[in-house]
């Protein structure tokens, strides 16, 4: 019971009033979305919001009592796997992390140490540098996918060769406890439990994060995938820790 742990409701009301008078919206859906995100960004102690906006004077030529939109938004916990095996590998990974820091819809909570791993697949290429990042984000899964794809593109990522070399690779490993099964997005990452180069850095920052399908922690999955067993994701990783971030 500490006031330091609460949000000042008067300040929140003033923020809403200022936000809605200084910005123009055509749709109440947009008002709800943008105001909610604004509140979550402005007041760090707010983790989730149920928000309703009423429009009792909507231009509807029929009898009605009220028109309203209700939404729920929150800071979502996500874990990203990052990797590079072209050029300044560490520089590309740090560029990705900096881009996440600069994104007002993301909060970087933790970054693992980087590890060096052998590549997977038939393509001869340099070893990878891999790491994991823990974030909170206002993005929904598809929005987060678009964001990490943009960050990859800014690092000149190309997809010409399957399992080929890349300047930057970012994968959404976990997103809350959600299961997403879409054509262009699978969460949790479909091969994460088989890949040391994902689990090893992920354990550094989230050993007790749980795979929502396998119902196993990161530590448990890593324990089952020992280096003397062949890693399905990299053929037996040769791992070396790099500088701490």
Predicted feature locations:
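Short loop/turn motifs enriched for small/polar and acidic residues
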Residues: 52-56, 114-116, 173-175
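Solvent-exposed residues in well-ordered beta-strands and their adjoining turns
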Residues: 54, 72-74, 83, 134-138, ...
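Residue-level signal for inorganic ion chemistry
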Residues: 35, 85, 111, 201
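N-terminal, polar/charged subdomain of small-to-medium soluble alpha/beta proteins
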Residues: 1-78, 245
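Short, surface-exposed acidic-centric catalytic microdomains
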Residues: 1-10, 95, 99-140
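Extended accessory regions or peripheral subdomains of proteins
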Residues: 77-97, 105
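Flexible, gly/pro- and Lys/Arg-enriched active-site loops
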Residues: 120-127, 139-145, 150-245
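A generic structural signal for short beta-strands and their flanking turns/coil linkers
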Residues: 47-49, 65-67, 104-110, 127-131, ...
